[in-house]
Curated annotation (Swiss-Prot):
Gene3D superfamilies: Vaccinia Virus protein VP39 (3.40.50.150). GO terms for cellular component: cytosol. Belongs to the methyltransferase superfamily. RNA methyltransferase RsmG family. This is Ribosomal RNA small subunit methyltransferase G. It comes from Yersinia enterocolitica serotype O:8 / biotype 1B (strain NCTC 13174 / 8081). Specifically methylates the N7 position of guanine in position 527 of 16S rRNA. It is found in: Cytoplasm. Keywords: Cytoplasm, Methyltransferase, rRNA processing, S-adenosyl-L-methionine, Transferase. Its EC number is 2.1.1.170.
Length: 206
């Protein structure tokens, strides 16, 4: 699996220290193991997990600004855990409402020794951001409007950002954003061996 990860990282132009590579592989191994009983992801093949979960998450890293983030609707820790592994200097709250997912996140935290993640079981509307976050990250929301509606209380004002991971560029959604929200950028992400487009939408309050 290390050989495959090295190949993907090289194709994406990403360099990581060996410790982070081994942590990423350890995460995939845990996800594969727990997935058999807990059905955490529809991706069954660990090699595909490297593409669709690991690379698809860490390509976001160069675009993150700040050091305190929340991954909303993180599921089994995506994109939060891969990002936390490659950003040991930053702190990530991993928020999900489902107990089995949060139990898995705590197991990953324990086994991989990740001191910079904080798994939390909560509905997003019930979670108090104290202090507010530099960035709110998610690939769980169906629409940008949903993300802004549910997560409006989480980022610091005015410098906090929303980072939405999307497939095709969501031009229809971008055209109907609520007042007071500006599009800082829409970045096309390059994920080796991933079919389909990936975009990162970065939004701010003005």
């Amino acid at each position: 699996m290390l050989k495959k990860l090295d190949s993907l990282l090289s194709a994406a132009g990403i360099e990581l220290p060996d410790q982070q590579k081994h942590q990423l592989i350890g995460y995939v191994e845990l996800l594969d193991k727990w997935n058999k009983a807990y059905n955490l992801t529809s991706v069954r093949d660990p090699m595909q997990m490297l593409v669709r979960h690991i690379l698809d998450s860490i390509v976001v890293n160069p675009h993150l600004q700040g050091s305190r983030f929340i991954d909303v609707g993180t599921g089994p820790g995506l994109p939060g855990i891969p990002l936390a592994i490659v950003r040991p200097d930053a702190h990530f709250v991993l928020l999900d409402s489902l107990g089995k997912r949060v139990r898995f996140l705590r197991q990953v935290q324990h086994e991989l020794g990740l001191s910079n993640i904080e798994p939390v079981q909560s509905r997003v509307e019930d979670f108090a951001a104290k202090p507010p976050f530099d960035g709110v990250i998610s690939r769980a929301f169906a629409s940008l409007q949903d993300m802004l509606s549910w997560c409006h209380h989480l980022p610091a004002k005015p410098e906090g950002r929303f980072y939405a991971l999307k497939g095709v560029r969501p031009d229809d959604e971008l055209a109907t954003l609520p007042e007071g929200i500006v599009v800082e950028s829409v970045v096309r992400l390059r994920v080796p061996e991933l079919d389909g487009e990936r975009h990162l939408v970065i939004l701010k309050s003005n």
